[in-house]
Amino acid sequence: MSPTLRLTISTPASLLVNAQAIVALRAEDGSGSFGILPGHADFLTVLTPCVLRWRGTENIRRFCAVEEGVLRVSEGHSVTIACRSGMLGDSLAALEAQIETARARTLDTARNARVEQTRLHAQAVRQLLRYLRPSRGDA
């Protein structure tokens, strides 16, 4: 049994974390919050949107917000997390600020897309009305 864990967190686009010396990890799934220590039994679970917290051998806490994912523990020392997206932070306050900024940017993008969609829809309706209505000069 190894006294540390190896943590890998990846998204489809990047490798967020590849840490060799982790002594403890906390995460959340549908049943609630749980912790993983070196020597943990093999384990597979689906994560809910949560903030992963871990501590390395240097006793520094790290954080990663994930938007759902799959966590796998294998051989008692390897923890692998695959998620759709993740955001790293050295403190919860900084991570919260990053998440709020990203959420605001996402909402703004969605709002702009809805406005553009409405504009295109109105333009298409006007074009159809021009085509379907006979012009006054043709009568």
Swiss-Prot record:
InterPro entries: Alt_ATP_synth_F1_esu, ATP_synth_F1_dsu/esu, ATP_synth_F1_dsu/esu_N, ATPsynth_dsu/esu_N
Disulfide bonds: none
One GO CC term on file: proton-transporting ATP synthase complex
UniProt-annotated location(s): Cell inner membrane
Main localization, broad class: membrane
Keyword Transmembrane helix applies: no
Domain of life where this protein originates: Bacteria
SUPFAM superfamilies named among the record's database cross-references: Epsilon subunit of F1F0-ATP synthase N-terminal domain
GO terms, molecular function: ATP binding; proton-transporting ATP synthase activity, rotational mechanism
Membrane topology: Peripheral membrane protein
Keyword tags: ATP synthesis, Cell inner membrane, Cell membrane, CF(1), Hydrogen ion transport, Ion transport, Membrane, Transport
Pfam families: ATP-synt_DE_N
Protein family (similarity comment): Belongs to the ATPase epsilon chain family.
Quaternary structure and interacting proteins, as annotated: F-type ATPases have 2 components, CF(1) - the catalytic core - and CF(0) - the membrane proton channel. CF(1) has five subunits: alpha(3), beta(3), gamma(1), delta(1), epsilon(1). CF(0) has three main subunits: a, b and c.
Described purpose of this protein according to its UniProt entry: Produces ATP from ADP in the presence of a proton gradient across the membrane.
Identification of the protein by name: ATP synthase epsilon chain 2
Species name: Paraburkholderia xenovorans (strain LB400)
Gene symbol of the encoding locus: atpC2
